[in-house]
């Protein structure tokens, strides 16, 4: 039987779904296979350690990924929880490094120089608090990354006016 071309407009919704179903299923399988291949690449060292010189099946890859994630989670729990201050400091440092990297990638403008100078300045002494901080309050950020910002900028100018902040 020769293939026939039928106008899609003439098909009923039920027939359209029947034609579309294999295409959708193939796309779903392709996504699954792609994700399994990415897992295999991410966990390549783990696979080499447990099963050297073996052809891994998809089920093996998924089992190894689950095992690795469980092991990683248990290891992180055994290391102990981070304090809020440490967690905040790490996040602040990472954000500051990203901002400095972004600012140094582009041609220097007056605004960029002001921002970089602002990142380099030591923090102003905090006013004494009338009440003790709440348990969930964010601690003061670590300023070790401010030194990294200073090293990233070879020249720093004193800004003529204060830096505008939206807060």
Swiss-Prot record:
The keyword Nucleus applies. Residues 88-119 form the Orange domain. Coiled coil: none annotated. Residues 124-138 have a biased composition (Pro residues). Keywords: Developmental protein, Differentiation, DNA-binding, Neurogenesis, Nucleus, Repressor, Transcription, Transcription regulation. It comes from Mus musculus. Has a particular type of basic domain (presence of a helix-interrupting proline) that binds to the N-box (CACNAG), rather than the canonical E-box (CANNTG). This is Transcription factor HES-5. Residues 16-72 form the bHLH domain. Its main location: nucleus. InterPro entries: bHLH_dom (IPR011598), HES_HEY (IPR050370), HLH_DNA-bd_sf (IPR036638), Orange_dom (IPR003650). PANTHER family: BASIC HELIX-LOOP-HELIX TRANSCRIPTION FACTOR, HES-RELATED.
